UniProtKB/Swiss-Prot annotation:
Keywords associated with the record: Acetylation, Allergen, Calcium, Glycoprotein, Metal-binding, Muscle protein, Repeat
Binding site for Ca(2+) 2: D90, D92, D94, K96, E101
Extra remark: This parvalbumin has an isoelectric point of 4.40.
Protein name per UniProt: Parvalbumin beta
Tissue expression pattern: Muscle (at protein level).
Record: residues binding Ca(2+) 1: D51, D53, E55, F57, E59, E62
EF-hand domain span: 38-73, 77-112
Length: 113
C-alpha cells in the first residue's frame, strides 16, 4: 500500500528491520525506512493509508497490520508489539493514534535512529 510513496529500498529496509516476529523495534524504525525525512504532507499520505477505515485515527487493529502496508508479504505485528506501538504513539490516551500523534511519533523515533 505504501508503494509509490516509499522507494523500493525503503520497503526492503522495513522488511529487514522487522522480518522476525518480535523484532519490531519502535526506536529508530522510521529512520531505518526513511520516514524521518518525509514532509508533513507525505506523512499525512502514509497516515491515510494506515487509517484503513478512514475515521481519522489509527486504531489497534489497523496498527497490527502496519508492516503489511509496507509490503503484503510482511507479517502482522504481535500483540505485544502492537500495544507498545500504540502506547508510544497515543499521547492523549484515547486508545488510538491521530495524524498529529503519528507525525510526532515519526519525529521522536526518527531522531533516535
Amino acid at each position: 500500500a505504501f508503494k509509490g510513496i516509499l522507494s523500493n529500498a525503503d520497503i526492503k529496509a522495513a522488511e529487514a528491520a522487522c522480518f522476525k516476529e518480535g523484532s519490531f523495534d519502535e526506536d529508530g524504525f522510521y529512520a531505518k525506512v526513511g520516514l524521518d525525512a518525509f514532509s508533513a504532507d507525505e506523512l499525512k499520505k502514509l497516515f491515510k493509508i494506515a487509517d484503513e477505515d478512514k475515521e481519522g485515527f489509527i486504531e489497534e487493529d489497523e496498527l497490527k497490520l502496519f508492516l503489511i502496508a509496507f509490503a503484503a508479504d510482511l507479517r502482522a505485528l504481535t500483540d505485544a508489539e502492537t500495544k507498545a506501538f500504540l502506547k508510544a504513539g497515543d499521547s492523549d490516551g484515547d486508545g488510538k493514534i491521530g495524524v498529529d500523534e503519528f507525525g510526532a511519533l515519526v519525529d521522536k523515533w526518527g531522531a533516535k535512529g
